[in-house]
A protein has these predicted regions:
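C-terminal/domain-terminus segments
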Residues: 76-109
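Flexible, glycine/small-residue-enriched loop-and-beta-strand segment within the central core
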Residues: 1-79, 110
């Protein structure tokens, strides 16, 4: 895990690195943020039928959070995510959605 200069993390943040998490300079997080490059299973319907505690730990890559990113309260950043510099998410994302891109678009509903 690499954390840049002048980062501020809110209360009760949870960071876990199985492979790699890179956080740039000047990153700000709210409270209760989770940043984890691993999960209990893949994002497929088959794996979702298995209770999370019984799934094998899975990681498909790293997390990169570039400079000057603001992550609000209760956000969850998972494996394979890259957040470009100076980014802030300002719109709702529907439940059970996988989103990508800038602007964000839904690529999968699970």
């Amino acid at each position: 895990m690499i954390i840049g200069d002048c980062c501020n993390f809110g209360e009760y943040n949870h960071l876990t690195a199985f492979k790699s998490i890179k956080i740039g300079n000047g990153v700000l997080t709210g409270r209760w943020v989770t940043i984890s490059d691993n999960s209990h299973g893949e994002t497929s319907l088959e794996h979702l039928k298995i209770p999370p505690a019984k799934r094998l730990i899975y990681s498909k890559g790293e997390i990169i959070i570039e400079d000057n990113v603001w992550i609000g309260d209760k956000a969850t950043i998972l494996v394979g995510v890259k957040i470009g510099e100076n980014s802030v998410v300002t719109k709702d994302i529907p439940p059970y959605s996988v989103v990508v891109g800038n602007p964000v678009r839904i690529i999968k509903n699970i």
